[in-house]
């Protein structure tokens, strides 16, 4: 069956979107191709309205191993749960789609992105959002797109649209931007400390480049798009009471209740105002129909609270905890609260508190990253934990949520930019952010706590990093940017803009817009205000730890790096691994690389040093003429074996022991005796002949050892018939 294909150029390569050939029973279906990367993207919504009071949208990103010609490595040889990369890719798509569904839309909607082919150069994570935008645009699902998404890199000072995997390794930034025709909706960035102005320029560049994709999707919608189905919005008559409820709330003290500093106390006071107002409308909560009426009134009252909070911010520059728009909450920091951890710190900002813990390990602890676009070992891990007690709630605890994975990834990108290279600091690093209290910006507090824990552990980071979450309240042309937002401001505001960086520039950024998008001018103002807040936080961190501790934590393991001749690796390994097992039995882990780099890892510094000395002995290349203070380790009728250094013995012939003729070696030497010896010769098998330097010239030198086999034995006698 022949479908209809639409094409445009993006980043110098053709992007094609086809519809009408695959998955035709679904509401919206497209097949997208870019290079040899292909995706099938579908969109479907239920006909009946969901009883949920939020948008029931799910986005699934399905990686298929056949896309790169692989068979899954699982026991059943089939794909399992989505990996971290797939979850992050799904979140990128979700964040650009969600704000554009109409208000009151409550139909369960599912977008599924299936990677059919991956060329490992053109990443599917930024193609999925384009496919989702196209599938929704041509479907019968109400949605306010289209949107487009591109990645921007910067190589040699030039911006590149959708850089290949090879180009991305040389890029100063990895920026993903999604937007509509007129505005930016979502930004995700990791960078090697770039300026705020460079970021804004890159975002503007991305927005201009995505216009061709938006043109293409609009053309698709005009030619093959379906009529959108009608849905029933909230339509509750109680919503008409919002102005009346607002008057009653103001009379009941809503302003003072909202401006209460502490979260629990504020919740209690606003609840008391709400309940008093509702009681005036429903005096008997047990009456028939009262429960539904109360629920509807609560929903309407929530709008009143939102309106009042936004009014206070815009008109009076007052926030829920009494701060103005630019203020950062009070900060309290403690370094090394955990006595046995390699590095630890507590970072508290207002009612958000995170315990950061750093653990140092060896290459054996690195994690294998094996997805459709990457096969590598990651030597830096950051795990973000968000238990229910952090918000004073009771919830089921299970595996990591998508939110935890996303927040951890952002913090990881922020910190990775300042880590030393593995050659400079040969440790695998695991950071854990334990969120103990959460009232906004817990991921940014994780960045601060994590960096402090690294410095406490003695990790030589390039510079401290801090993070701050920015917010926005916008009504028409009037807006106010907020620094260090509360959870309440995140829920009721129009933007969540997280910015991380050093004093010199930005290392990571994440922006989600809940309105139709923001202009570059608002973005510049938000970045400038974020820098102001970030520098304030860095100053508070410096009061406790301004730089990494000069020495590793006493509880941290020690790693000693040794470089040997690669031809001597066999000596360290030994026959069947015998030698390396003996080394590890001394209390250390030993890793050996093909280039001759050996790393000795031990929690016991003395054990690590002993193993290093043993390896140095095993790999030392003895030379004729060198003298050693040796120890007799064995005697034989023909001479004594003398240990020169770890792993290397030489033989002192009986004729070279004394000026006098000896009938037995034991007449002059016994096991354990120490003596000065000199290397007289080394045969082709590495066997060492020794002499005593003080007797040199006084006794006749011994003839060199004859080679064992392989010499010239003369001609073979004639064969007898």
Swiss-Prot record:
Mg(2+) binds at residues 490, 496. The keyword Transferase applies. Its cofactor is Mg(2+). Its EC number is 2.7.7.8. The keyword Transferase applies. It is found in: Cytoplasm. Residues 625-693 form the S1 motif domain. Keywords: Cytoplasm, Magnesium, Metal-binding, Nucleotidyltransferase, RNA-binding, Transferase. It catalyses: RNA(n+1) + phosphate = RNA(n) + a ribonucleoside 5'-diphosphate. One of its GO terms (molecular function) is magnesium ion binding. Its main location: cytoplasm. Residues 693-721 are annotated as: Disordered. Gene3D superfamilies: GHMP Kinase, N-terminal domain, K Homology domain, type 1, Nucleic acid-binding proteins. Belongs to the polyribonucleotide nucleotidyltransferase family. Involved in mRNA degradation. Catalyzes the phosphorolysis of single-stranded polyribonucleotides processively in the 3'- to 5'-direction. This is Polyribonucleotide nucleotidyltransferase. It comes from Deinococcus deserti (strain DSM 17065 / CIP 109153 / LMG 22923 / VCD115). The gene is pnp.
């Amino acid at each position: 069956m022949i479908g209809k294909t639409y094409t445009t150029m993006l980043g110098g390569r053709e992007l094609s979107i086809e519809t009408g050939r695959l998955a035709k029973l679904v509401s919206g279906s497209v097949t997208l191709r870019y290079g040899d990367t292909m995706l099938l993207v579908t969109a479907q919504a239920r006909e009946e309205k969901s009883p949920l009071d939020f948008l029931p949208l799910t986005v699934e990103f399905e990686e298929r191993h056949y896309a790169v010609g692989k068979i899954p490595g699982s026991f059943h040889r089939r794909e399992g749960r989505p990996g971290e990369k797939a979850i992050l890719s799904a979140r990128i798509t979700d964040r650009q789609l969600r704000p554009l569904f109409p208000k009151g839309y409550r139909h369960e909607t599912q977008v599924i992105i299936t990677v059919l082919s991956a060329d490992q150069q053109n990443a599917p994570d930024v193609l999925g959002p384009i496919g989702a935008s196209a599938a929704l645009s041509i479907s019968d699902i109400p949605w306010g797109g289209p949107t487009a998404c591109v990645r921007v890199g910067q190589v040699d000072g030039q911006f590149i649209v959708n850089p290949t995997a090879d180009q991305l390794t040389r890029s100063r930034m990895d920026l993903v931007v999604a937007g509509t025709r007129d505005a930016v909706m979502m930004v995700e960035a990791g960078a090697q400390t770039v300026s705020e102005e460079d970021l804004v320029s890159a975002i503007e560049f991305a927005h201009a480049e995505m216009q061709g994709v938006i043109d293409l999707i609009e053309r698709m919608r005009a030619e093959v798009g379906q009529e959108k189905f009608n849905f029933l919005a909230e339509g509750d008559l109680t919503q008409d009471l919002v102005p009346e409820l607002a008057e009653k709330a103001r009379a009941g003290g809503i302003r003072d209740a909202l401006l209460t500093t502490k979260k629990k106390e504020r919740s209690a006071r606003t609840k008391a105002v709400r309940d008093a107002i509702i009681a005036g409308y429903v005096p008997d909560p047990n009456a028939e129909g009262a429960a539904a009426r109360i629920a509807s009134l609560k929903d309407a009252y929530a709008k009143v609270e939102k309106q009042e909070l936004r009014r206070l911010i815009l008109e009076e520059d007052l926030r829920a905890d009494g701060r103005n728009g630019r203020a950062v909450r009070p900060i309290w920091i403690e370094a090394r609260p955990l006595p046995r951890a390699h590095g630890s710190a507590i970072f508290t900002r207002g009612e958000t508190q995170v315990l950061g813990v750093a653990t140092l390990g060896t290459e054996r602890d690195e994690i294998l990253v094996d997805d459709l676009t990457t096969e590598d070992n990651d030597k830096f891990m950051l795990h973000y934990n968000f238990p229910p007690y952090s918000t004073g709630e009771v919830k089921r605890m299970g595996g990591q949520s998508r939110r935890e994975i996303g927040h951890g990834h952002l913090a990881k990108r922020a910190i990775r930019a300042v880590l030393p290279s593995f050659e400079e600091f040969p440790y695998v690093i695991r950071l854990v952010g334990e969120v103990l209290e959460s009232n906004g910006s817990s991921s940014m507090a994780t960045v601060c706590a994590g960096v402090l824990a690294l410095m406490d552990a003695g990790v030589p980071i390039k510079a401290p990093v801090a993070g701050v979450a920015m917010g926005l309240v916008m009504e028409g042309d009037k807006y106010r940017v907020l620094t260090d937002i509360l959870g309440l401001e995140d829920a009721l505001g129009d933007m969540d803009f997280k910015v991380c960086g050093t004093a010199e520039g930005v290392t990571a950024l994440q922006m989600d817009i809940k309105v139709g998008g923001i202009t570059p001018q608002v973005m510049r103002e938000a970045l400038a205000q974020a820098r102001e807040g970030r520098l304030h936080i860095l100053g508070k961190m410096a009061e406790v730890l301004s730089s990494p501790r000069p020495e590793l934590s006493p509880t941290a393991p020690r790693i000693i790096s040794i470089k040997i001749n690669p031809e001597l690796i066999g000596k360290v390994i030994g026959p069947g691994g015998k030698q390396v097992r003996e080394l590890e039995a001394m209390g250390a882990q030993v890793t050996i690389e093909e280039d001759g780099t050996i790393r000795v890892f031990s929690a016991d510094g003395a054990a690590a040093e002993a193993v290093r000395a043993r390896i140095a002995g095993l790999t030392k290349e003895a030379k004729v003429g060198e003298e050693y203070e040796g120890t007799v380790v064995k005697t034989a009728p023909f001479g004594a074996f003398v240990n020169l250094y770890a792993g290397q013995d030489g033989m002192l012939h009986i004729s070279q022991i004394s000026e006098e003729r000896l009938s037995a070696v034991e007449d002059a030497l016994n096991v354990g005796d120490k003596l000065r010896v000199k290397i007289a010769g080394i045969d082709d098998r590495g066997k060492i002949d020794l002499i005593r330097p003080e007797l040199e010239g006084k006794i006749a030198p011994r003839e060199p050892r004859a080679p064992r086999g392989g010499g010239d034995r003369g001609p073979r006698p004639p064969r007898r018939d």
